[in-house]
Amino acid sequence: MPERLQVYKCEVCGNIVEVLNGGIGELVCCNQDMKLMSENTVDAAKEKHVPVIEKIDGGYKVKVGAVAHPMEEKHYIQWIELLADDKCYTQFLKPGQAPEAVFLIEAAKVVAREYCNIHGHWKAEN
């Protein structure tokens, strides 16, 4: 059963869906159940995927990886998301852009999530 803020992917066409309101049904695309994307938190590949959260004046800066993640046509971060105080903030990225986002919000505790088009869904908490 899908739950709020879970991320699902279609293994056939690549559609990605974030659940806004969980229900009792299954998520289906291209006549197949969509796959729940697990949130990875440990990166064995030299820490290029785990979000790094930095408190800045007036908000938070999220960088993808302790070592900057590639942002090439075939391998890049599609989006960075910040969850805070029951709100969700998303910055969509394109190849060539820096793998980072600034969110000008005040919150004591935040969760950063990002999605790599090849290596999937990653998460970190402050």
Swiss-Prot record:
It comes from Desulfarculus baarsii (strain ATCC 33931 / DSM 2075 / LMG 7858 / VKM B-1802 / 2st14). PANTHER family: SUPEROXIDE REDUCTASE-RELATED. Homodimer. Is organized in two protein domains. The N-terminal domain has a fold similar to that of desulforedoxin and contains a mononuclear Fe(3+) ion, center I. The second domain contains a different mononuclear iron center, center II, with a Fe(2+) ion. It holds the Pfam family Desulfoferrodox. It comes from the Bacteria. The gene is dfx. Gene3D superfamilies: Desulphoferrodoxin, N-terminal domain (2.20.28.100), SOR catalytic domain (2.60.40.730). Disulfide bonds: none annotated. InterPro entries: Desulfoferrodoxin_Fe-bd_dom, Desulfoferrodoxin_Fe-bd_dom_sf, Desulfoferrodoxin_N, Desulfoferrodoxin_N_sf, Desulfoferrodoxin_rbo, Desulfoferrodoxin_SOR. GO terms for biological process: removal of superoxide radicals. Fe cation 2 binds at residues 49, 69, 75, 116, 119. It catalyses: reduced [rubredoxin] + superoxide + 2 H(+) = oxidized [rubredoxin] + H2O2. The keyword Metal-binding applies. GO terms for molecular function: iron ion binding; superoxide reductase activity. Belongs to the desulfoferrodoxin family. Its EC number is 1.15.1.2. Binds 1 Fe(3+) ion per subunit. The iron ion 1 is coordinated via 4 cysteine residues. Catalyzes the one-electron reduction of superoxide anion radical to hydrogen peroxide at a nonheme ferrous iron center. Plays a fundamental role in case of oxidative stress via its superoxide detoxification activity. This is Desulfoferrodoxin. Keywords: Detoxification, Electron transport, Iron, Metal-binding, Oxidoreductase, Transport.
